[in-house]
Amino acid sequence: YNGSEVSVEPDGSVYPCCVKTKLPIGSLLEDELIAILDSLAGEPAYEAITMGHPERMGIAHGWSEAKFVERSATVTPKGAPYRNLCIGCDRFHEEVLGPILEAARARRRAMRAAGLASRRQPVPTADVER
């Protein structure tokens, strides 16, 4: 996982980069981080992010770099044009990666059920006394 970066939210959600995308790639409440990363290893979209080229994340799924850049455009609340690759990434997650992430989650769940996952358990969230 050299060069890869993930973000983890307090609720256990794991995101594929330094900022939150529309869909988490998994949850530490369900799986260990390595299991989540292993389940998506080789997925071209995440390989592109890891290599520092998010604009290439859709090529294997029919999104050219030009389409990705086009889908990265929006308009600010004041009506000014704005473009950011993170917007394209969010749209790609919404439109394409949802079923891929769900399939990876189902594979991890099946491995757990079959006893093939690591014997270590995810770290439980701490109970906070009020």
Task: Give the location of each predicted region.
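Short, small/polar residue-rich loop motifs at catalytic or cofactor-binding pockets
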Residues: 1-2
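Short, acidic, Ser/Thr-enriched surface-loop or helix-capping motifs
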Residues: 8-9
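Short active-site-adjacent structural elements
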Residues: 15-17, 96-97
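Short cysteine/histidine-rich metal-coordination sites, predominantly Zn2+-binding motifs
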Residues: 32, 101-113
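Cysteine-cluster motifs in flexible loop/terminal segments that predominantly coordinate metals
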Residues: 61-104
